[in-house]
């Protein structure tokens, strides 16, 4: 059954219902943003019906007293304070300002054209005077790729922030919108850059390739957008490429991303015949003219061969909206044609409610149809006042409070990105409430340290513009603020904190040291800086091997940092063989009764612990429980037991890797009046853990990577052979016009150097992405090899 048939069936089933019954209670026009790394909350049932042109009318009753009352309600009863009420009580001048602000990110699969699209946005908004392409073909490179490495490799490594103004025609007059924009990397190794950008943004543009459609990293980005409840519009890029099929991409958005999507444009021509688009809401043809497509020409005349497609897609747009918006559903039932204003209002409501994404089309590289996408950002993505942001009140046992984007209220902001510059540490801050002013003091909610703000700047890639203050809903950067990524700042009047972004665990490690010992100081500086900037870049010193170990999201991730150390700090490094982040887990339930007794005169050690260890049933973590009755072990010694359990889990008995999926229960024990201590019980627990663990037939777990490979169809057999050689589990294959895609779960251990083999097998035309999927029991032969290697290394160290 087709999507349209299902939709019509649903609408017919509503035909007998009274209109009032179709309107859910508790409508909410605005998206609900929970500032946490928790999974997606439920989507609001339906939007309100307040017309757009009335939402921002000046309210004469606004005053500082009103703002204070709103703040009080936001703290005491956040669930009763709607975003509409916040907007209606806003100062008229402030309402006018914030209604024209958009905080957006551009995200996509690698090589979908994010940076190229951003370059056109900056050019058409007048932010830059000339367009430069990625890879630095003209020895300049794209504006947002400010690092030499980015321009050389043609990839984005760090998210880059900028701002621009877009003048849009509304009802015959020009309206200026202020856009804060963040361009993000597409490579999975730099996923933290996407996480922290989406954490503080109100909306996003999801870019898809017209040929490839939804790809592996598109699915990852979609998951990240859902994690932070970010509404999005979609832009199908590369419409001029051979094999482009935008409607297949829209179908994939519906099916693979499980998101209602419909075109708001149709192309005029495809591939090398692509000339422009038809706006199917207003039924106008749109073309770009001028050397770089800077002139937008609208025509009422739609090409005869395109009109039937435009009319059919307009009908499909209305049907899709009827499925997610009550107003359009009512018009559909009454067989009335919605007006342009009604359609745009419905698209905006459904987009902000995250039940729908409007799909635009164009070619950034060919300078076609980028400006209509800019109009879509203004029309359909929310302003900061339309997104609900929550914080935690530390004075009220971390009760949830709503942040109110009024400039007059006490300041609350979140540091979401750190960067080293020539002038010191640069801290990017999103202002959620109040105003951040130069020269004022702010307080770090994590450590309650007071910090003076010496300089505030607005960033334009690697350039900056000094400002004296930044209002609610804006993004800026400050100098001289010592903090960590994810810290909350206030002006001291409120004791609020905001939860940080989701940080994935590293999957690959390698040893590193400077080739020349005189470079140790710079080596340490670089390591410390990179750790502050990137939460997924981890460093620790292995006391047994006496090596510095760096960990990250993939080979490319660590290679980039090694190269940055050479370029930015002039430190050449030697690196060891990449190490896989294996894990260990218990095999079966085992009981233990362990006594630690050392009494040789003077203070001794005495601790007895008894209980059992067993699998938890999942690999999310480990559990420690005490079921002591009769006080055989005192409370303070039980804390020591729990600490010993944690230390034992940090370094497993099999090969020294972390333990997962293990529960330890202590239900009995004994103490000595003088010889028992916290140290004794900590050591006894660790010893009991090791013995019980080894008796349980334990397993080594290896990380399996979700791997997606795309290559020309003629190389399919060679690629499958490469995967079979690595014992990969092939989950699915898709065959396109001239290329194929393989989805597989691969052992990370078998994927080192895979890019070289793939290039050789596909004449350099194949590409692949990997991201962590899950842990699986390692094959028996691999477990034996790893244990033998570990024991050999341990024996060698003990000989020294």
Swiss-Prot record:
It holds the Pfam family EFG_IV. GO terms for cellular component: mitochondrion. One of its GO terms (molecular function) is GTPase activity. Mitochondrial GTPase that catalyzes the GTP-dependent ribosomal translocation step during translation elongation. During this step, the ribosome changes from the pre-translocational (PRE) to the post-translocational (POST) state as the newly formed A-site-bound peptidyl-tRNA and P-site-bound deacylated tRNA move to the P and E sites, respectively. Catalyzes the coordinated movement of the two tRNA molecules, the mRNA and conformational changes in the ribosome. GO terms for biological process: mitochondrial translational elongation. This is Elongation factor G, mitochondrial. HAMAP family: EF_G_EF_2_B. Keywords: Elongation factor, GTP-binding, Mitochondrion, Nucleotide-binding, Protein biosynthesis, Transit peptide. Pathway: Protein biosynthesis; polypeptide chain elongation. It comes from the Eukaryota.
């Amino acid at each position: 059954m087709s999507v349209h048939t299902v939709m019509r069936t649903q609408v017919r089933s509503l035909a007998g219902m009274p209109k009032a019954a179709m309107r859910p209670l508790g409508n909410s026009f605005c998206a609900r943003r929970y500032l946490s790394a928790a999974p997606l909350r439920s989507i609001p049932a339906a939007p309100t019906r307040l017309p757009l042109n009335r939402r921002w009318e000046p309210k004469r009753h606004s005053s500082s007293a009103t703002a204070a009352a709103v703040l009080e309600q936001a703290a005491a009863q956040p669930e009763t304070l709607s975003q509409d009420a916040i907007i209606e009580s806003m100062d008229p001048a402030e309402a006018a300002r914030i209604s024209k602000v958009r905080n957006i990110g551009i995200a996509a699969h690698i090589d979908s054209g994010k940076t190229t699209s951003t370059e056109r946005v900056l050019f058409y908004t007048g932010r830059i005077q000339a367009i430069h392409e990625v890879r630095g073909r003209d020895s300049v490179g794209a504006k947002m790729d400010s690092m030499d490495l980015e321009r050389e490799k043609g990839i984005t490594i760090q998210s880059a922030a900028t701002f621009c103004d877009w003048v849009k025609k509304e009802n015959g007059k020009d309206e200026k919108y202020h856009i804060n924009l963040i361009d993000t990397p597409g490579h999975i190794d730099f996923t933290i850059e996407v996480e922290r950008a989406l954490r503080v943004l109100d909306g996003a543009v999801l870019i898809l390739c017209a040929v490839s459609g939804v790809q592996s990293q598109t699915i990852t980005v979609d998951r990240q957008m859902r994690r932070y409840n970010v509404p999005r519009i979609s832009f199908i890029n590369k419409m001029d490429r051979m094999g482009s099929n935008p409607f297949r991409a829209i179908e994939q958005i519906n099916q693979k991303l499980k998101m209602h999507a419909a075109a708001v444009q149709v192309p005029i021509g495809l591939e090398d015949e692509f000339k422009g688009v038809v706006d199917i809401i207003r039924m106008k043809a749109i073309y770009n003219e001028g050397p770089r497509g800077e002139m937008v020409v609208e025509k009422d005349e739609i090409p005869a061969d395109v009109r039937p497609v435009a009319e059919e897609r307009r009908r499909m747009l209305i049907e899709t909206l009827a499925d997610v918006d009550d107003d359009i559903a009512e018009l559909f039932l009454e067989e009335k044609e919605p007006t342009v204003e009604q359609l745009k209002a419905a698209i905006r409501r459904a987009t902000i409610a995250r039940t729908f994404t409007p799909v635009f089309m164009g070619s950034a590289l060919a300078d076609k149809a980028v400006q209509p996408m800019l109009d879509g950002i203004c029309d359909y993505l929310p302003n900061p006042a339309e997104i609900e942001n929550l914080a935690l009140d530390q004075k009220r046992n971390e009760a949830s409070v709503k942040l109110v984007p009024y400039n007059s209220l006490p300041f609350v902001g979140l540091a979401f990105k750190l960067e080293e510059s020539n002038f010191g540490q640069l801290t990017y801050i999103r202002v959620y409430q109040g105003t951040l002013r130069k020269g004022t003091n702010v307080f770090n909610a994590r450590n309650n340290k007071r910090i003076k703000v010496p300089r505030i700047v607005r960033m334009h890639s690697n350039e900056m513009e000094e400002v004296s203050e930044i209002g609610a809903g804006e993004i800026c950067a400050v100098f001289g603020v010592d903090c960590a990524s994810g810290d909350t700042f206030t002006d001291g009047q409120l004791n609020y904190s905001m939860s940080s972004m989701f940080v994935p665990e590293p999957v690959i490690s390698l040893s590193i040291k400077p080739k020349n010992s005189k470079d140790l100081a710079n080596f340490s500086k670089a390591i410390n800086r990179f750790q502050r900037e990137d939460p997924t870049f981890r460093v620790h010193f292995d006391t047994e091997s006496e090596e510095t170990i760096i960990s990250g999201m993939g080979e490319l991730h660590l290679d980039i940092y090694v190269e940055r150390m050479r370029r930015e700090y002039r430190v050449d490094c030697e690196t060891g063989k990449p190490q896989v982040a294996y894990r260990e887990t218990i095999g079966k339930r085992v009981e233990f009764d362990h006594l630690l007794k050392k009494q040789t005169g003077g203070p001794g050690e005495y601790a007895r612990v008894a209980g059992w260890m067993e699998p938890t049933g999942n690999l999310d973590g480990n559990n420690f429980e005490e079921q002591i009755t009769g006080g055989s072990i005192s409370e303070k010694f039980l804390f020591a037991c729990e600490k010993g359990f944690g230390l034992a889990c940090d370094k497993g008995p099999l090969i020294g890797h972390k333990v997962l999926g293990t529960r330890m229960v202590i239900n009995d024990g004994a103490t000595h009046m003088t010889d028992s201590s916290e140290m004794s019980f900590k050591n006894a627990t660790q010893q009991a853990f090791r013995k019980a663990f080894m008796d349980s037939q334990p397993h080594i777990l290896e990380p399996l990577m979700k791997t997606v490979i795309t290559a020309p169809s003629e190389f399919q057999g060679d690629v499958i052979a490469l995967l079979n050689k690595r014992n990969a589990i092939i989950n699915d294959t898709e065959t396109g016009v001239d290329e194929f895609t393989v989805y597989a779960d691969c052992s990370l251990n078998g994927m080192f150097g895979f890019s070289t083999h793939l290039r050789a097998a596909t004449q350099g035309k194949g590409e692949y992405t990997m991201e962590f999927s899950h842990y699986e029991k390692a094959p028996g032969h691999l477990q034996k090899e790893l244990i033998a290697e570990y024991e050999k290394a341990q024996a060698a160290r003990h000989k020294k």
